[in-house]
Each structure stands twice: as C-alpha cells, then as structure tokens.
C-alpha cells in the first residue's frame, strides 16, 4: 500500500507515479497495454446501479461492460494472480459466469455489512417491499491453473501431478519414498479424490529427481512446466496464489460507511446521472471503499 492518500483535485488526465505505485487518471483500457503482470487485481467498477457516469442502469448490462476488462485481466495475469471483485450481490452473480469462462476460479464471497447507519432515515416502511440493503460484496477469484502434458494437451494440477508420476512407470507407492514421508505423497499429493493437497515445491522437486533416476527414460523431464527444463522448488511454489491468514477475520466485514476525513468530497461533479446539485460536502464516489478494507485485501492475497 502507498504511504499516503492521493487527493484528486482536478480532472486533468495526468498520471501520478511514485516508488510504489502508478495512479492512472483516465480510462483503464488505455493503461492495460503497459500493465505489468499483476500479483493481485482489485476491481471496483460498474455495479448496474447508475452509480457513476458510465455505469449501467441495471445488472443486465454488466457482462458487456466488464467483458473487455476481464479479457485484459485474463491475458496479463500470472498463474498465481488473484482477483477481488467488488459489486452488489446480483451484480457479482451476473458477472460470475464471465469470470469462470475466462479461467477465473471462484474461492469465496466476502460481505461488507455497513450496519443500520447506512439506511437511517432513508427507508419508508409503508412502501418498501424487501429488506433494506446494507451490504456490498467482494468475491475472491484465482486463476484456474492447467499444465501441459506430453501429448500436447493440458490437465488441472491434481490430474497433471498423477499423470507425470504415472508417466515414469513407477508405482504410486514409491512417491512416498521419493518425498521421504510415510504416506503423505499418495494420500495427499497424488491422490485422485477430494483429499488432494497442493504439494510444496520441495516435494515436487524430489519427485522429479526420483523419477528421473528411477523411471523410464524420457526426453521430456518429469514434472517439467515447459517440457524442457527440470522443475525447481521455487518455480513450483510461484505457481500458487498467495494467501496470508489472519486469525479472527471471517468473510463478513462489519464497518459503517465512510463519514470521516478519508471520504473524498468536493469535486462538485455529480457522481451519477441523478437529479441533485453537488456541494463541497457531496461525496465524490457513492461507494468509496475504506482504506483498511483495501489494505486487508492486499495483505491477504499478495
């Protein structure tokens, strides 16, 4: 995270660069060509609620709105890239199939509970026909990792590991000897069922070395990612998305909306095509996210 909050005082299309960040002031589609492969993407775009100029009027238009962005995220992502996708419940549900179709694997949904202060004075009990909404959601996705096989196809990680070991002609039980464990290799790393566990890079490197020395001769190194070079522990570990656990945090985050000095105000621009005259106290963004949420997401997944 940057050490300071950058206040946007005008609308000139001028980028702001620092040692730890580049803030592009303009259409993000113009920034993608120079975008380095991201470790983490945090998306807070269209919600389908007319929330800003360019937002859609309903969730129905969100797939078309996000399609060019999802294409760029998918094109430039690394195997270990994670994505936080902010939206309404129905907005996220609408875009979810698009993300899945582009190789993003759903992990979980985080709910921001803003509490009763978010709706205080804004609910007419005589006319409302649903529970008042005090939430937004942020879905966590990771890249669906597939790896190349000897015959030119691809397999998911779990299936690929089994296929590489079987390619050696060795019985699965000898993977335990290769890893120096009692039964963890066959019970976790090479199992075909739901008990599968991502093996540490050290164990994959050990299996690769063992199959090279004891398996059938092959011109393609066992467990090689590119089919030419032998796998190293660090290379394998780099394929896995980062997760930094914090005790006590769950997938429900309770916090009131921003009403302090962190809230961006005073642009005198209407934040959506709505009928009101903005003042110096009007929020610049109707759904501005708290910095502590941003810090939490970045720390957890990068």
Language-model segments: which ranges?
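Core catalytic lobe of class I
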Residues: 1-4, 9-302
